[in-house]
Structures are given as C-alpha cells and as structure tokens.
Design a protein with these regions (language model features):
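Viral RNA-dependent RNA polymerase
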Residues: 1-346
C-alpha cells in the first residue's frame, strides 16, 4: 500500500478511506489513467454511512418555504396536469390508453434479464402484503477532501417491480407530452441538438435581448422533502396508481399502494448491511437515489417549480408550444426550457 494506492500484479487499486486506518484496507476502485492527485474514495463502512446521513441529509435539509399563494399555484398547475380538459399530460384517458399496452417483460430496465424480473415478481406474489425494504450504502466515488460521502438508498428488486407500472406510465406520458424538453432516449449529441433546436429564440424576441439560465440543484435529493413532493408529485403518483389498480387486475393492488404510501411518508426506515456491519436508521424522507422514478419525478419537480416561481399562470405552460406569460412582477415574458433531473436550461 502506497498512501491511497495499492499495487497488485493485476492492476492498481484505490484504497477506501476510513475513520480508523488501523483496520483492514478496502479496495474501492481501480486506476485506469494517470493521476496528479491521489483520489479520496470513502470506504464501504458504517461510520462513513453515518457521516453521510449527518452531513449530507440532516445538515443540508431545507423546509419548504413557499407562501400560501405559491402553494395555490402549484396545486392549480398539478390539478390541471391531471384533470384539465386540454394539455393535461396525465389525463385519465392518456393513462388508460397507455396501461393496456404494457407488459412487465417489455417495460423492465434494459439492464434486467427476464429471469431477474420473473424472480422478483414470484417473490412478491408469495407475500400477502409486501412492503418496501430500503437498503443504504456509501457511494463509491472520488470526493474532494472537505466533502462528506454520499448515501445511496435502494428500493432493491422488489421495490423496483412494485413501482414499475406506475412510474413507467408517468415517465412515458412526460416523454410523449414534452418530447423536446428532455434528453431521454437519445445519445448525448443528438439530445443536445434536439434541445438547442427546440429552444431556439425567435428573431422578434431576440431583438429585446434574452437571458439564459443554467440551473443545477444544490443537494437536490435532500431538499426534495416530503412537503414539496406532497404538493408536486404525489397527486400524480396517486392518480396513476389508482388507474393501474383499476385496470391491471393481474397486478395486486398492494404493489401500487405500497409504492404510493412510501412516497407519502415523512420518515424513512433504512438499513445498512455491508461487510458484516448492520444498523437501522430513521431519516427524514428525501428523494431516494435508488427509486425507479428518481429521474422522471425530478424532471416533473423541476418543471413545475420553475414555472410556478416565475409565472402567475404556470398551468398555461402545460401546452408544450406555449411561450408567453405574465411573470410575478407583472411583466409579459417569453420563456422556453428543457430539463434533466436536477439540471435545467431556461
């Protein structure tokens, strides 16, 4: 071992950093390219997980600080997205038209084999009332010296399957309704081309000068608290889950209900079971990194919050072609945007 590097015949490994350097060393990665500074990768151990909870969750959380007027705008926009007569991405008709075409083997992650899906479904079918079991771990990644490790919270295979039908519907409906406001389904190069073409500023607008914003959420998962998710995304999850339960007689209602119930909880019970260490923790509910819906729900959160923060009538922008609206200062403003997770381009 040379500092944070260990040399073996098969290659050069990266030693995981721990609070106690006297114990057995963990190899947490490999070097494939020359480096100028030794990497700081936190080891997979309980002390690092506890540090991640304290530094990354407890200290970074922010309460929802919207006013009553903000809350009303959010509720109005979300209600319009579900029950509106026009431009509602999650209307009952759109959900039902999509649901009857879905088969688990076809909507599973491309990384999953059919055997893995079948085993997860069979395991769930052996239980009367299956529930989510959240597992935590330390994310193995190089970090700046002063930064604490990041915590991963996984729903595991059972949770992925129970959430799959609901989340796949939401994800697909967002892609269909806002095809040019995201980058899913394309290579990076093609996605950027599509976004830049869609966000091209008309000459008439450009004459008045245009401001471009690039947004990158700070501690995004941690600040997606139960209170803001209850306003923005839980109504959509509950609406789609009810449709799934009403149509998919072959899928136990308990699956969609367990998923919707977990998303509404204010506390999360997580367990850490790695390298013969075991501990249970209860944390304030945040966005789970291993949730099947992390990507599309982050997109929806980003889209709704930006429009509600800027405009008096944000629900008008549920029409993908709508560009003008009166902002909170009373100015008639032109806006176009695209999103990916916690990143935004306006």
């Amino acid at each position: 071992v040379e500092g944070r590097i260990i040399r073996k015949e098969c290659g050069i490994g990266v030693v995981g950093q721990t609070a106690d350097d006297t114990g057995r060393k963990q190899v947490c990665g490999v070097l494939s390219q020359p480096i100028s500074v030794e990497p700081n990768v936190y080891a997979q151990e309980l002390n690092n997980a506890v540090m991640a909870i304290e530094e990354r969750i407890n200290k970074k959380q922010r309460p929802y600080a919207g006013s009553a007027a903000d809350e009303l705008k959010i509720k109005r926009m979300v209600h319009q997205a579900i029950h509106g007569k026009r431009n509602s991405p999650f209307s009952a008709k759109k959900v039902m038209d999509l649901i009857h075409t879905l088969v688990y083997e076809e909507i599973k992650s491309k990384k999953w084999t059919e055997t893995r899906v079948s085993e997860a479904i069979e395991s769930l079918c052996r239980e009367i009332d299956p529930q989510f079991k959240l597992k935590s771990s330390v994310k193995l990644e190089p970090m700046p010296e002063e930064k604490a490790p990041r915590l991963l919270i996984a729903d595991e295979d059972r949770g992925q399957v129970m959430a799959l039908m609901t989340i796949y519907c939401i994800e697909t409906l967002i892609k269909k309704h806002f095809p040019e406001k995201g980058i899913k389904g394309l290579s990076k190069k093609d996605a950027i081309k599509r976004v830049m073409k869609a966000c091209r500023v008309p000459r008439k607008v450009a004459k008045k000068l245009v401001t471009v914003f690039e947004g990158d959420g700070s501690a995004w998962d941690t600040t997606c608290s139960a209170s803001i998710r209850e306003l923005v995304e839980n109504p959509v999850i509950n609406h789609v889950a009810n449709m799934v339960n009403g149509f998919m007689y072959a899928t136990p209602e308990t699956w969609a209900d367990a998923h919707a119930s977990l998303c509404a909880q204010e506390k999360l019970d997580i367990s850490y079971t790695k390298n013969k260490e075991y501990q249970k923790e209860t944390i304030n509910a945040i966005r789970r990194s291993g949730h099947r819906g992390t990507s599309c729900l982050n997109w929806w959160m980003n889209f709704v919050c930006w429009h509600c923060a800027i405009f008096e009538d944000p629900e008008l922008f549920l029409d993908p072609t709508h560009r003008y609206g009166k902002d909170v200062t009373g100015t008639n403003r032109w806006m176009n945007s695209a999103y990916e997770g916690d990143d935004s381009f306006l």
